Amino acid sequence: MAYQSELGGDSSPLRKSGRGKIEIKRIENTTNRQVTFCKRRNGLLKKAYELSVLCDAEVALIVFSSRGRLYEYSNNSVKGTIERYKKAISDNSNTGSVAEINAQYYQQESAKLRQQIISIQNSNRQLMGETIGSMSPKELRNLEGRLERSITRIRSKKNELLFSEIDYMQKREVDLHNDNQILRAKIAENERNNPSISLMPGGSNYEQLMPPPQTQSQPFDSRNYFQVAALQPNNHHYSSAGRQDQTALQLV
């Protein structure tokens, strides 16, 4: 058994069946003591690493063997951790507990944060022109320069967005124009392939029957229009087309 070898083969009243339990005392056998040291040292270093990773703790471990050999581990810096320890001890004058040290640290941090909040609030009030009565001419010039630089950046960003929107609308206009041309070409081709469609009210000749566009001084009124066919004999026809003339006239 390994534990027997560590104890030099001596039986112990603390030894149990299965995994044994040894008495914690100095191992007299040099070889067994060195083997035990290596095993326990590795386990201690592993535990220190796990503690630093799992608990986000600052850990520093220093071990000297019986032969004077140094073994150390630190997740940050052994020297830095020692300096922090010395500072904590000196600040507390060797009388404070860990809880008191932590409380003092958090009080200092909260005081710094409160000071930063007050400084930011004062700066915002100055930018809004609320607390400029007690400012010197130099401070006012500095504040004016800050505001001008801020306005310049804001206008630059605004113009950038406007130009981007204009560019998008222009591209959109070109796309719509191209789509319109394609649709017109398809309609014309469809009418050429199907001449009967042009005779329908929805055909291209239907546009020729519509009156010319009106100016603003002469609004459109459907009662001012009538068909020429109403003024001509019912039997009048074109000899070539064989249909009535439907040219629209406007009463003035």
Curated annotation (Swiss-Prot):
Tissue specificity remark: Detected early in the floral meristem but mostly expressed in stamen and carpel primordia.
Region (Disordered): 1-20
Disruption phenotype: Mutations result in the replacement of the six stamens by six petals and of the carpels by a new mutant flower.
PROSITE patterns assigned: K_BOX (PS51297), MADS_BOX_1 (PS00350), MADS_BOX_2 (PS50066)
Gene3D superfamilies: Transcription factor, MADS-box
GO cellular component terms listed in the entry, alphabetical order: nucleus
Any Pfam family matching the protein: K-box
SUPFAM superfamilies per UniProt: SRF-like
Coiled coil: 99-166
A molecular-function term among this protein's GO annotations: DNA-binding transcription factor activity, RNA polymerase II-specific
GO-annotated biological processes: cell differentiation; flower development; positive regulation of transcription by RNA polymerase II; regulation of transcription by RNA polymerase II
Residues covered by the K-box domain: 103-193
Induction entry: Negatively regulated by the A class floral homeotic protein APETALA2 and by other repressors like LEUNIG, SEUSS, SAP or CURLY LEAF. Positively regulated by both LEAFY and APETALA1. Repressed by silencing mediated by polycomb group (PcG) protein complex containing EMF1 and EMF2. Up-regulated by HUA2.
Function noted in UniProt: Probable transcription factor involved in the control of organ identity during the early development of flowers. Is required for normal development of stamens and carpels in the wild-type flower. Plays a role in maintaining the determinacy of the floral meristem. Acts as C class cadastral protein by repressing the A class floral homeotic genes like APETALA1. Forms a heterodimer via the K-box domain with either SEPALATTA1/AGL2, SEPALATTA2/AGL4, SEPALLATA3/AGL9 or AGL6 that could be involved in genes regulation during floral meristem development.
The protein's name in its UniProt record: Floral homeotic protein AGAMOUS
Organism: Arabidopsis thaliana
